[in-house]
UniProtKB/Swiss-Prot annotation, chains A, B:
This is Phosphoribosyl-AMP cyclohydrolase. Homodimer. Keywords: Amino-acid biosynthesis, Cytoplasm, Histidine biosynthesis, Hydrolase, Magnesium, Metal-binding, Zinc. GO terms for molecular function: magnesium ion binding; phosphoribosyl-AMP cyclohydrolase activity; zinc ion binding. Pathway: Amino-acid biosynthesis; L-histidine biosynthesis; L-histidine from 5-phospho-alpha-D-ribose 1-diphosphate: step 3/9. Mg(2+) binds at D83, D85, D87. Its cofactor is Mg(2+); Zn(2+).
Length: 127, 127
């Protein structure tokens, strides 16, 4: 894959997010569980396509990060999709270990029940 | 559900997106297909919880919109989750008709194959 060429053909609509030019990256496993959502700048996208492993852009640390660089919980890219208006990509990955830094399989492990935030084992906190 | 109280308990981290205070809203069907991702301001979230139907915030039109208000393709809220850092919600909905204004079931119907953008019937363009 010619990464420069692919990124051009994606015709992405970068958004002004926290003062940076970013797109949304939704990451799912092969069973369609949503693992996380994060941001990507063009460099993070290129690194992802070049290496085959997910890279994101951290708005708080203002830098590129390779998912799992400290925890070892890397995400191997399998395939990806673009949405209709081009400001979001959906990545299907093979998740090593867990996606969430809080130790849960998915970052979406807080369920809202009866108006309360509850950590739940249901649906998004397990494979 | 006391909507004001629930929104407070969600303890959301609104992001500066296109100059507005917004969160990310990922919407999936009951089979875990990702239908779309859009933005919500606090008003859109409250309207969603009050009415039981998805409302988003359009950054281009700079206004609240009720999903399906013109097409009739409304999204009935079933349940929802918050992510670990509080800048995103994941909504599980019952989708009437199709989610995408281009006529596809999901907005993520462009697959990237061999570096090319292809409209695909696979995975995200059908139930």
């Amino acid at each position: 894959m010619d990464v420069e060429d692919t990124v051009k053909k994606l015709n992405l609509k970068f958004r002004n997010i926290e003062g940076e030019r970013l797109i949304l990256a939704i990451t799912c496993d092969e069973n369609k569980n949503v693992l996380m959502v994060a941001f990507m700048n063009e460099e993070a996208l290129k690194k992802t396509l070049e290496t085959g492993y997910m890279h994101y852009y951290s708005t708080s640390r203002k830098k590129l990060w390779r998912k799992g660089e400290e925890s070892g919980n890397v995400q191997k890219l399998i395939k990806f999709y673009r949405d209709c208006d081009g400001d979001a990509l959906l990545f299907i990955v093979e998740q090593k270990g867990v996606a969430c830094h809080e130790g849960y399989y998915s970052c979406f492990h807080y369920k809202i029940e009866d108006g309360e935030l509850k950590i739940t084992g249901e649906y998004y906190s397990k494979r």
